[in-house]
């Protein structure tokens, strides 16, 4: 149980219109995206509190706020992570344990690369054209108008895992290229 840093980064998503989503889709999104982190936190948080040091970090998504109509169950599961993390942080009051959520924007992950390739093939376009269309049509609020790199998100996680971030607890930290448009 000597875990100092827990990063809850597992996640699945299935893009379907609401009318096509099954209860199984909803259950799967919550089981993997939320409940895996709940179970791991339940297991490791008591020991972190006992040792008076630890970091629990959840990875959410901009979809928790910018909800696409074809990702409802995914988006709701990610919004639940934000709420759970905020509440869990309250249990660490007076300790050197922190619980925070990283909220990345559209990131060029393996899943995003596959999406770009499949869409390019289906629409007879280049991956660059598909990406440009995505940021013009779907995520036009992005101020950087590109996918975040995995390294950009990982560097944020590294910071919030470190003692340097000891003053931040219970936060949802955006790494979204400005896509959410909030000043807070």
Sequence positions of predicted segments:
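Alpha-helical segment proximal to the catalytic Tyr-Lys
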Residues: 46, 90-91, 166
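Short, small/polar-rich loop/turn modules that mediate ligand/substrate recognition or access, typified
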Residues: 93, 98, 168-170
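Residue(s) in the substrate-gating loop at a strand-loop-helix junction
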Residues: 61
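Substrate-binding pocket helix/loop in short-chain dehydrogenase/reductase
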Residues: 17-18, 25-30, 138
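C-terminal substrate-recognition "lid" of short-chain dehydrogenase/reductases
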Residues: 38, 53, 142-175, 180
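Active-site helix of classical SDR
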Residues: 41, 77
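Active-site loop-to-helix junction immediately N-terminal to the catalytic Tyr of the SDR YXXXK motif
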Residues: 21, 67-75, 87
């Amino acid at each position: 149980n000597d875990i100092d840093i827990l990063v809850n980064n597992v996640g699945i998503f299935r893009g379907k219109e609401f009318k096509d989503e099954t209860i199984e889709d909803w259950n799967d999104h919550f089981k993997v995206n939320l409940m895996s982190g709940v179970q791991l936190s339940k297991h490791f948080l008591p020991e972190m509190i006992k040792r008076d040091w630890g970091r629990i970090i959840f990875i959410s998504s901009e979809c928790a706020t910018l909800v696409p109509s074809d990702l409802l169950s995914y988006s709701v599961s990610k919004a639940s992570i934000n709420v759970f993390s905020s509440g869990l942080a309250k249990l660490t009051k007076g300790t050197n344990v922190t619980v925070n959520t990283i909220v990345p924007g559209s990131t060029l992950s393996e899943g995003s690369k596959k999406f770009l390739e499949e869409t390019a093939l289906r629409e007879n376009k280049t991956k660059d054209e598909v990406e440009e269309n995505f940021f013009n049509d779907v995520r036009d609020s992005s101020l950087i108008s590109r996918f975040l790199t995995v390294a950009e998100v990982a560097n944020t996680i590294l910071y919030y895992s470190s003692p340097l971030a000891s003053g931040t607890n219970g936060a949802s930290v955006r790494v979204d290229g400005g896509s959410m448009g909030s000043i807070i």
